[in-house]
């Protein structure tokens, strides 16, 4: 890897460490609840007529949705594979017996230096966030070491960057039919061939209108904010 690549990788890994603190600080208290139906834990599926080329055929797992806006991770835009050891080498850390590669995804156009690991719920750290009862997310360099040491979750999706919407922006885009809504089936999130994810998700969409979303609390939708910005 080039010197430039190592510097960028080091910056990305450092962002993992910073992100851990941000995720924990952003968690709501036990009495907080969404004021309206939340899409947290569901999939956004870009309509075939999506006008934004950044989201053409994109499938996005929504991890936060509330009055302040929404945050999601694109799950079907792989950008390559990276040796797990390189994340630690870039920071000058001992990588021990960490072996193997991890597939890396572009999670969205916002802050691509930030890393997120979406994973199955069989793994948990203090900073882990439950998106649903079948999907979790951890933003910590420690999870990469555990994956390399064969102590990590059974299913993993590592993404850098995210998609973000301001207040009422996502609702408006859904009303304009830019997005369909589908269940976040873990098989679709982790196992389906990435070239097929959009086709399968589009066929499975259950709502095309925000107004059609059942007014029930979705598991994990109490997450009011994943990121805090200065």
Model segments located where?
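Bacterial N-terminal signal peptides that target proteins for export
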Residues: 1-10
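Bacterial N-terminal signal peptides
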Residues: 10-19
């Amino acid at each position: 890897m080039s010197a430039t690549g190592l510097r960028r990788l080091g910056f990305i890994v450092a962002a993992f460490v910073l992100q851990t603190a941000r995720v924990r600080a952003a968690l709501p208290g036990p009495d907080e609840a969404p004021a309206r139906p939340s899409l947290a834990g569901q999939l956004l599926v870009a309509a075939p007529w999506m006008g934004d080329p950044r989201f053409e055929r994109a499938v996005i797992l929504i991890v936060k949705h509330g009055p302040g806006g929404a945050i999601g991770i694109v799950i079907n835009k792989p950008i390559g594979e990276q040796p797990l050891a390189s994340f630690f080498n870039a920071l000058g850390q001992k990588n021990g017996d960490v072996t193997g590669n991890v597939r890396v995804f572009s999670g969205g156009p916002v802050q691509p230096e930030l890393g997120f690991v979406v994973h199955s719920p069989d793994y948990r750290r203090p900073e882990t966030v439950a998106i649903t009862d079948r999907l979790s997310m951890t933003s910590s360099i420690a999870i990469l070491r555990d994956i390399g040491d064969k102590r990590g979750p059974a299913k993993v999706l590592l993404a850098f960057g995210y998609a973000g919407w301001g207040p009422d922006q996502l609702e408006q885009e859904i009303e304009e039919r830019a997005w369909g809504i589908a269940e976040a089936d873990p098989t679709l999130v982790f196992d389906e061939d990435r070239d097929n994810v959009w086709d399968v998700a589009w066929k499975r969409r259950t709502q095309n209108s925000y107004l059609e979303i059942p007014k029930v609390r979705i598991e994990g939708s109490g997450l009011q904010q994943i990121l805090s910005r200065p």
